[in-house]
Amino acid sequence: GFGMLFKFLAKKVAKKLVSHVAQKQLE
């Protein structure tokens, strides 16, 4: 359903955000 799609997208975005923040921390 729509809820699952939303969760899937949220996970993808969260991963991108985390890796982005992690890279900024490393610099």
Swiss-Prot record:
Q: What is its main location?
A: secreted
Which pairs are disulfide-linked?
none
Where's it found, cell-wise?
Secreted
> Pfam families, per this entry?
Cu (PF17563)
Q: Has keyword Transcription regulation?
A: no
- Top-rank taxon, per record: Eukaryota
Residue positions, PTM Glutamic acid 1-amide: 27
Q: Which family does it belong to?
A: Belongs to the cationic peptide 04 (cupiennin) family. 08 subfamily.
Q: What is this protein called?
A: Cupiennin-4a
Write down the species.
Answer: Cupiennius salei
Read off the lineage from the record.
Eukaryota, Metazoa, Ecdysozoa, Arthropoda, Chelicerata
